[in-house]
Amino acid sequence: RGAVDALAESLSTAKPLFFGRVQRVRRMANELAMKQDVPNAWRVDVASVFSQLAYLALPENVTEDVYYRRDLSKEVKSLLAKFPEDTRNILNKIPGLEEVGEILKSVDVQYRFEEEKEDGVRLAASILKVALDFDYYEEQGYNRSIIVSTLKERNKDYDPKVTQSLSDLIVIAEETSTLQEIKIDDIDIGMRLSQELRLDDGFLIAAAGTDVDRQLLKVIRNYNSCYAESPFPKRVQVIVPVNLLK
């Protein structure tokens, strides 16, 4: 688990947008795997991280275009087409992660065309697909309930038992956390960014969905200490667990 965390952290500095996606997808996929009682659920966790790892190789000038799926040049599309193979090559060099590669390979295969086996690979792939697509649509600004309804209706593309678990998780999340707008100085460990955190000049520090941990808090404080006035927006939207509410 420590090695996987280190891989995820490598994205936080180099590609904060994709690190934010890793955190969101990883969190969602792990919760879905728990509800579905997936065998060897650690594979879902690892696959969530590796699903975004190849984006480390993206040139900085096209990172946001790729992340937001804007119009891309033929050259960039060609580069992206090689990412699945690049990821498999990395996985092939790590003993014991063969099934993680199988999960990633099956994500874009409709679940009904692959038989579910005892190894749980098909179910794990279905979970990762739901987590990835839910995250994409939420990033586009769609309401969570609409996303869930849409995925549930597309029962030939998404495993119904996984989308039902997704629906259950969204209800629980709404009951156990709340959206608040707070001063940047009040941000604290355990909160989660609900919007991108950028400097006043537009430089991205952390993506929406990033968990506020000691490292991010340190980065914010370091920036504040280097400027006469804080370079961050005066207020920021965060998700606050109910147990942190004062």
Regions found by a protein language model. Name each.
Residues 1-5, 22-23, 27-28, 65, ...:
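Terminal helices and disordered tails flanking the catalytic cores of nucleotide-processing hydrolases
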Residues 13, 54, 109-111:
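Active-site/binding-pocket entry motifs
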Residues 43-47, 127-128:
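Active-site alpha-helix of zinc metalloproteases
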Residues 46-50, 103:
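Short hydrophobic alpha-helical segments used for membrane anchoring or interfacial signaling
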Residues 55-60, 141:
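Regulatory and interdomain segments flanking nucleotide-handling catalytic cores
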